[in-house]
Amino acid sequence: MFWHLDMYPTHPAAEADEGRRGVVMESPGKVWLMTIEDEHWRSRHGARAEIGPLSISSGEEYSAQHVEAVFTPGMTAPDHFHSGPEAWYTLAGETCLETSDGRVQIGRVRGRAVMVARGLSMHLSATCTEQRRALVLILHETSQDATLPVHDWIPKRLCTQNPVDPPQ
C-alpha cells in the first residue's frame, strides 16, 4: 500500500477525485486529497507526492488516522508506538525521530518522507528554529488503538547527538 498526497486548488476539486479510500483535508491553507491505494493508483488531477510502500499484514483490517501535526521548536512527543505503520510528509520545519531499532530519521521540507514500521517505539522531537508542520498518516489495526504509550523502552537520545540523514 502507498499513501498518495495530492494538492488541489479548491475543496470541490479534491472531492471530485476523492474515491472510496480518499480523504480531503485542508492544512495550512492548502487542500489535500490523501488516498491509500496501491502504487499504480493516480488521481485525475492534483500535484502529487507518493509515500510507501507501507508494510501491512494481509488479512488484517486497518483504519486510517490523518492528522496535521504542529510542533514548536524543541517540542517532543511522548514516547509511543502504533499497531500499524506511520508516515509523515513535512510541510515546514524539521523533526528527528529515534526508533527502538536504533535508527534515526530526519523529516524536513523537500526531504524524504518519514516511515515507521508497526510496533517500533518512537521518540520524536522538533529540531528546528521554526514551527514544524506535517501531514501524518497512522494506518493502525482497526481492533487496536491508533497510538499507545511506551513504558518499556528508554530512548538513547540519538537525536541530540548531531544526527545525519541516512544514505538514500
Residue ranges and their predicted role:
Residues 1-44:
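N-terminal accessory interaction module
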Residues 70-71, 82-98, 139:
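Short, conserved beta-strand element in jelly-roll/cupin
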Residues 19-31, 96, 117-145:
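Ligand-binding loop in jelly-roll beta-barrel domains
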Residues 25-27, 59-62, 81, 89, ...:
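Extracellular/periplasmic catalytic domains that process cell-envelope and extracellular macromolecules
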Residues 39-51, 55-56, 127-168:
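Double-stranded beta-helix
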